[in-house]
UniProtKB/Swiss-Prot annotation:
Top-level division of the source organism's lineage: Bacteria
UniProt name for this protein: tRNA-specific 2-thiouridylase MnmA
Residue sites binding ATP per the record: G33, M34, S35, G36, G37, V38, D39, S40, M59, G148
Chain spans, region Interaction with target base in tRNA: 119-121
Gene: mnmA
Amino acid sequence: MTTSTGFDNNAYNLPALRLSDVPNPAQTRVVVGMSGGVDSSVSAVLLQQAGFQVEGLFMKNWEEDDGTEYCTAMEDLADAQAVCDKIGINLHTANFAMEYWDRVFEHFLAEYQAGRTPNPDILCNKEIKFKAFLDYAVTLGADYIATGHYTRRSVNYTREDGLEVAHLMRGLDNNKDQSYFLHAVGGDKIAKTLFPVGELEKPEVRRIAEEHDLITAKKKDSTGICFIGERRFKDFLQQYLPAKPGNIVTDDGITIGKHDGLMYYTLGQRGGIGIGGVKDRPEEPWFVLQKDLSNNELIVGQGHDHPMLLSQRLTAYKLDWVERIAPAAIFSEQGLKCMAKTRYRQPDQSCTVFADSDDGSRVKVIFDEPQRAVTPGQSAVFYIGEVCLGGGVIESFE
């Protein structure tokens, strides 16, 4: 990984790109990732209204069985086709299930086996939606791809080495901003992507869908991990990883129950632990404080802000900087002063980032205030103003 030169915060003052800023839309072909949801549907409408040559692509990323997931996928494809028919554009389909299994799902299982809590959506965006999809769209003659993500991007700029890139920016709707999930996508890929709904708030997106009588106008937003569907997470994971039950132990060493397997729990979790009333303990909620892999014990304690859940430092690795260049400031004695999120929708947290490797692919982060339930396997994502700098996988905390 290369390090940047002359880094300063002014480098992130480029304006957001609007559809009207793209020259010659009538000669510009855009392939939209059509998920069968309202956001991608409206993205296609907005691109069409702006005068682009628009086509759709439905991605099949998981080989479903004949159960609920299969029915949901078929419904999504039917809805995507109905929207494309309604607005008069072609819909292509592509099967990326093999790529998804190799690049995303196997990593997902390995992380759970190692006792961490991964976020497969981040890897899916990096490896599938902005790699496999982008590559496929290019074979269709696309100048850009587009998605229904609530995020924005800057105008393109050229790095010193000649690579054309763009900044990833927060979506205008703070409640829906998805830049956290896109932080691992390189700026060269962002430069080839349009985010039509990034400038809108969700109610406006639904209003546009209703105005155009789209079948997806009132469709419920999808939640959770795409390949799990409506199944219980525990039931799904048991199909692929053997459960290893063990003891539930209090923070002062008392065994008070049995857990079903450490992979089913995450730090800070309150519900679903299976602890009833405990003798000589107050009637207060119990929280997961630690997963002791060496002894296969789930450590629990009482108190939402238990000291074991609070930390002010973390180490992150596998850093993906959007610019594909680590900011020079992380190599300085002062470090990089910025904001961070250690989970989706967390309010910005002020911190300082220091390089922990020669190439900036590993960092130490010191927060101004203690953080609750920092979770290994999740991502720490960094921001300056509206711009998402990138992020990495949380390895440890203290």
